[in-house]
Amino acid sequence: MNKVAKRKIYFLGIGGIGMSALARYFHKKGCVVLGYDKTESPLTRKLEDEGILIHYEDNPNLLSDDIDLVIMTPAIPKDSLQLQWFKDNKIRITKRAEVLGELSRLTKSVAVAGTHGKTTVTAIVTHLLNYSGKRMSAFIGGIAKNINSNVIVGDENDEVMVMEADEFDRSFLHLSPYISIVTSIDADHLDIYGDEQELVKSFNEFVAKTSENGVVIYNHKLPVTTDRKHLTYGFEDADVMARNLRIENALTKFSLVTKEGLGLGEFEMRLYGKHNVMNAMAAIMACFQLKIDMKDIREGLATFKGVQRRFDIRYKDDEVCYIDDYAHHPEEIKASLSAVREIFPTKELTLVFQPHLFTRTRDFMDEFADALSQADKLILMEIYPAREKPISGITSSVLLDKISCKQKQICQKDELLDVIQSSRPELLVTMGAGDIDRFVPSIEMLLQS
């Protein structure tokens, strides 16, 4: 994979956050990059602006036989006409995860896994290494605000490569990291794994991929087992622990101490919530293992701007604050809303939530109801299906009936702006992993007016 210049690479499902990062990587490496996605989006438009040709029609007549390699996302359906054409013409087809696996073996790599928190940790590690001057490449599962991108493309002199490790369809088992990080293991993707026990087993298989001279870093509460060198982090009973957590001057501040009582100093950041202190700890420990000076780590963390759609404060004035967040699992919702309450304890919280996947809504119906009941007002959108077909009896209306907050309603997409306007929110949060992000600019404009 390190000798790729001038190859012609086609991406099936180029508009996904992970696929677009790979597309940008190979494009900047000098490859001819083009691809297909089902729908146009702000991200695909940016790729086109960068010189990448994208088709929005599953039409084999748009393809040419000089394509050297096809990289596909697991979201592409098996009956895709373009996929079948590539198979018929015996053009090499590989999965995104397999390509990342090859790249992870080019140099020392840091792989960040977890059902929640992995994008933020990946982005923090990337920023801290970049700030310290390390020669590096990075693949992030979101748009990091410091670089306004989801990728950093280095060169053959890279000292380290950082990548987000996706547990969906066991993709992360293709990686060979020097440092592996596990942030969380909560039941999710049960349509793939069947039960939580299988999910835990898969995470431990990922950890086992860590090189023999490498290190495993993980949340001390997790059921991780490894014979590699390992370090844990948390608020208690861990190798590294956070102390004196507080918010001062709109910054989160905390100190770190080892289990032996050694103080590692004070840190501050623009992120909020205990979950983000945990995320910062994982990133700090990884960078320290890579011999980054603690002064650079401390300064870098203070300048980290966050990731788009991760507790993303989009608008704030004297009357209203608007936060957009990617949370789509009950535990993520709880953590995010807890952070919101911590910062704005007296404001009435209006939550707009778009459930993501019928299977996830089915598997965690009661947990979603409990988490969403934290809102004062709830505007619940219809379930975003993504790759799935509807499941009988699994609807937003069924979920709404289980939610205990007094003011709650179902809202269709074409009603959303009017409903928000009529609710006159003082603290508005939008959440979800579907297409709710497409409403964010319009909501910003509405609140500004």
Predicted features and spans:
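Nucleotide phosphate-binding/pyrophosphate-handling subdomain across enzymes
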Residues: N2-Y10, G18, L22-K29, A250, ...
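Phosphate-binding loop of NTP-binding sites
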Residues: N2-R7, Y25-C31, E48, N61-D65, ...
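Beta-strand->loop->alpha-helix junctions that form or flank phosphate-binding loops
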Residues: Y36-D37, H55-D58, T94-E98, F139-G141, ...
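C-terminal helical cap/extension that packs against the catalytic core
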Residues: A369-E426
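Short acidic low-complexity segments
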Residues: L53-D66, C411-V419
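NAD(P)-binding Rossmann-fold cofactor-contacting core
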Residues: G30-K46
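Conserved N-terminal Rossmann-fold NAD(P)-binding element of oxidoreductases
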Residues: I9-I14, M431
